[in-house]
């Protein structure tokens, strides 16, 4: 329907020389990339239809050689640092420090500061952003509006009950990643605070109280918006200890999250993957892959086998939602009925039984040449089980070949 109506409304649209999509392209902003005037930057490059659908030249990023070289330098510097600590963040002995993947922040994935800062609305998450310097609280209060602060000044660290997150102003507007890492990246791993110290309210250290008083003084002189933010942070400090006691105070989102985690913890022991006796589909033929040895002159997983779908290689009958069997299989699980000549055969010459066309003389050369001495081979040591005697393919409930040693 929608296609028809589009055709009717634009009957003579010529996409090749039409500038419509260029001018009215979709725009996309990320939260905090802004102009000098403070307006959010729009990326017009994305979601734009090409004039010529086969011309990809406009999609390519211009290669910024200076930026790439800057990142390479920083990778080498920081890997030297890691080497001094006897810590190799890359577990590959052939690591090439000159290799820079696209969109690299100068670190292999999982290491280095995290540059994807979240918006303030996301403050309920597990992590909070805190600075690592000695006078942490001082700097946090004083320079919360400092837009020149490099990203590496803040690092993700596990929350200890607080709901503190960076004020939006403290997130740097624009910074070249390469420059800032080398100056400010601190390689020391932050030591997480123990829960015991947090749960017991202690008198705050004098340095912290000083800084808080300083911040309160400065807040009086500053605008009301700043004071609101500082009061938020002070609230979060006071709530550290009360959060565990009063669960009703926390938001509904956080409750849901804890509930989910609890669920996950309870479900941990259950198997969600198919069991070993479930139906194994036939292996597809992969080009260049060596063929399976032809144990039975026709392998059980060979889809070209005319007898493949005769039913004996199906899994155990599945249960329906009402716990009834969907279809009853006469030959469900035969664990080797020793008295039944159909299922138990100690003689490897199958021509009498027609279960498997089989060459007993060739058997040990194909299957067990590295284990058994062919001169000493005794076929009486092996017994076969088959789920359905009329079928040439062994039952997949017992694996690809139904041979088990008769100990």
Swiss-Prot record:
Residues 7-32, 138-147, 184-201 have a biased composition (Polar residues). Residues 232-246, 259-270, 316-341 have a biased composition (Basic residues). Residues 122-137 have a biased composition (Acidic residues). Transmembrane segments: none annotated. Residues 1-64, 110-276, 314-341 are annotated as: Disordered. Residues 33-44, 247-258 have a biased composition (Basic and acidic residues). Residues 209-231 have a biased composition (Low complexity). This is Uncharacterized protein L645. It comes from Acanthamoeba polyphaga mimivirus. The lineage of its organism: Viruses, Varidnaviria, Bamfordvirae, Nucleocytoviricota, Megaviricetes.
């Amino acid at each position: 329907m929608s296609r028809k109506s589009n055709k009717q409304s634009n009957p003579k649209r010529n996409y090749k020389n039409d500038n419509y999509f260029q001018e009215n392209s979709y725009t996309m902003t990320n939260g905090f990339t802004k102009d000098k005037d403070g307006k959010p930057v729009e990326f017009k490059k994305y979601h734009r239809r090409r004039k010529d659908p086969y011309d990809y030249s406009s999609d390519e990023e211009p290669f910024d050689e200076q930026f790439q070289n800057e990142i390479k330098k920083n990778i080498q510097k920081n890997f030297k640092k890691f080497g001094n600590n006897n810590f190799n963040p890359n577990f590959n002995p052939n690591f090439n420090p000159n290799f820079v993947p696209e969109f690299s922040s100068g670190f292999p994935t999982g290491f280095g500061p995290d540059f994807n800062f979240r918006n303030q609305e996301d403050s309920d998450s597990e992590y909070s952003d805190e600075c690592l310097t000695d006078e942490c609280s001082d700097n946090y209060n004083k320079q919360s509006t400092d837009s020149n602060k490099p990203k590496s000044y803040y690092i993700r660290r596990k929350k200890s009950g607080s709901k503190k997150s960076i004020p939006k102003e403290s997130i740097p507007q624009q910074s070249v990643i390469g420059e800032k890492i080398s100056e400010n990246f601190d390689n020391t791993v932050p030591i997480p605070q123990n829960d015991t110290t947090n749960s017991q309210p202690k008198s705050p250290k004098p340095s912290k109280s000083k800084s808080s008083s300083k911040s309160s003084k400065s807040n009086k002189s500053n605008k009301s918006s700043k004071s609101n933010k500082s009061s938020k942070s002070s609230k979060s400090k006071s709530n550290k200890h009360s959060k565990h006691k009063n669960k009703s105070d926390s938001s509904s989102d956080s409750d849901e999250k804890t509930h989910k985690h609890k669920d996950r913890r309870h479900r941990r022991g259950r198997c969600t993957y198919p069991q070993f006796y479930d139906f194994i589909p036939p292996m597809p033929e992969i080009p260049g892959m060596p063929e399976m040895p032809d144990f039975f002159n026709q392998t059980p997983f060979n889809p070209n086998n005319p007898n493949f779908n005769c039913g004996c290689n199906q899994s155990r009958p599945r249960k329906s939602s009402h716990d009834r069997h969907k279809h009853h299989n006469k030959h469900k699980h035969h664990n080797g009925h020793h008295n039944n000549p159909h299922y138990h055969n100690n003689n490897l010459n199958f021509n009498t039984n027609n279960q498997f066309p089989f060459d007993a003389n060739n058997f040990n050369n194909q299957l067990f040449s590295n284990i058994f001495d062919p001169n000493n081979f005794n076929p009486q040591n092996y017994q076969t089980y088959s789920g359905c005697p009329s079928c040439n393919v062994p039952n997949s409930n017992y694996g690809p070949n139904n041979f088990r040693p008769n100990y």
